[in-house]
Design a protein with these regions (language model features):
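Flexible low-complexity loop/turn motifs enriched in small/helix-breaking residues
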Residues: 1-107, 111-121, 143-149
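Short beta-strand edge/turn micro-motifs at domain boundaries
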Residues: 123-148
Length: 149
């Protein structure tokens, strides 16, 4: 639900956007120093990729004041063999997805990961619970991709 001026007047009420934001902000704040840079340079921007286009736009607007800037990953970074760069410096692509916990109506599982140049750097799963006011992170697990077939 977007107004003509690009501002959001309403966000879908499924609650998943708030959970995604809580998990993503935690991941952005806690990314390792090693993952914050590409070689000797810091990333020019963080690209956001969410399959829900409204959530993707909302995340970019809500996190607009973060440094490095938050941008739409689709415009600046592709999964092709020729990664696109933004002004000659790389964009770290952040992925967010969320699903409701079928066994608990106020809990959500959020997947947050970051990818650089087709190499999956890290994925984390966040289990969050909503108390009617705020989201609380109950558990964070790193996905071990080294044992994947």
């Amino acid at each position: 639900m977007e107004k003509e001026d690009g501002l959001f007047k309403e966000v879908p009420g499924d609650g998943l956007l708030g959970a995604k934001l809580m998990a993503l902000e935690h991941a952005l704040d806690n990314i390792s120093d090693e993952d914050k840079t590409f070689g000797d340079s810091e990333y020019f921007a963080y690209g956001i990729s969410d399959t829900d286009s409204i959530h993707n736009k909302a995340i970019i607007k809500i996190l607009a004041n973060r440094k490095p800037p938050i941008v739409d990953a689709e415009k600046f970074y592709t999964r092709s063999s020729n990664s696109q760069w933004m002004s000659g410096r790389p964009v770290l692509k952040w992925i967010t997805e969320a699903t409701k916990d079928p066994s608990h109506p106020l809990r959500v599982n959020v997947l947050v990961g970051w990818i650089h140049s087709q190499i999956i750097n890290q994925f984390y799963t966040y289990k969050l619970e909503y108390d009617g006011v705020v989201w609380t992170i109950l558990q964070i697990e790193s996905l071990d991709l080294s044992s994947a077939p």
